Design a protein with these regions (language model features):
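Long, C-terminal-biased catalytic regions of enzyme "large/alpha" subunits
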Residues: 1-274
Length: 274
């Protein structure tokens, strides 16, 4: 009960902050956004004079309340995550429903598009753990990693099957309508098995996944052009000059070396399914 009350209070604070920011953003001038206004990307923007405030043009935007570290919060409460603990799963689901209640309340209050989104937190995942570690110390399964697990995702290290991971995460998609993703991590050989990939897509569809992703490593040797899973050196020419392409969450971001340290640690911990 204390946890859910805290969720409600925090979500309310965020909703108020978003409204305050929205009120400030309305005072911006149309000429500050030449591309957006000139191409009518924001509905009604093309009709504004350059020195007019954007005002109601922003009403069609979204005020998103995001969250991350659902798994870590459940470990703090129950000593285990929601991947295998039904009690932890129920609590996390109730917490996200509570955020939705606040979003719905503020939709009605201000007639604006408040939404709940499952935050991927490419940059924040490491920053928040450092802040919390300074405040609360090193807590196993909570603040002892370099990152927080994304939104409602099962822990990336959790020994769980592909199907079970999808089933545990799927119900959260319906209550994070501002944005969500569920991904499964495959090893390099799985990409050759079209039938297995088709089965995964079918399970995602049947379980109600709104946005699903199937990740697999794509490595290329810059020296000889070999493509495949390359661990340390190219198996053909022994070169260490390797391009390692990975999906950070929902999109490709170039070479793995360009990721921040927290997300590199997370990628290393991901369970790869064969």
């Amino acid at each position: 009960e204390i946890f859910i009350e805290s969720i409600h209070e925090t979500a309310t604070l965020i909703a108020e902050q978003l409204y305050e920011r929205y009120q400030y953003q309305r005072t911006a001038l149309a000429r500050q956004f030449p591309f957006m206004m000139g191409n009518d990307v924001w509905k009604g923007g093309a009709a504004l004079n350059p020195n007019e405030q954007v005002g109601d043009v922003l009403r069609s935007g979204t005020l998103g309340i995001g969250f991350l570290g659902g798994h870590n919060a459940m470990v703090a409460l129950y000593g285990e995550g929601h991947g295998h603990s039904q009690k932890a799963w129920d609590t996390l689901y109730e917490a996200v429903l509570e955020i939705n209640k606040v979003a719905d309340e503020y939709k009605a209050k201000y007639n604006l598009n408040y939404s709940v989104l499952a935050t991927p937190a490419e940059g924040l995942s490491g920053r928040f753990t450092r802040m919390d570690r300074r405040k609360y110390g090193k807590i196993k399964g909570v603040t002892d990693n370099d990152y927080y697990v994304n939104s409602f995702h099962v822990d990336v290290k959790e020994p769980i099957s592909i199907v079970e991971k999808i089933k545990r995460e799927a119900p959260f998609h319906a209550i994070t309508r501002g944005g969500h993703i569920t991904y499964v991590e495959l090893d390099g050989e799985a990409q050759k098995n079209v039938r297995a990939i088709a089965k995964i897509v079918k399970v995602m569809f049947d379980e109600g996944i709104g946005y699903g992703s199937i990740n697999h490593p794509v490595d290329t040797c810059h020296n000889c052009g070999y493509k495949g899973v390359i661990y340390d050196k190219c198996p053909v020419c022994q070169s260490e000059n390797i391009l390692r392409m990975r999906r950070i969450t929902g999109y490709l971001t170039g070479d793995l070396s360009s990721w921040n340290s927290a997300k590199r640690a997370e990628e290393k911990d991901r369970v790869k399914h064969g």
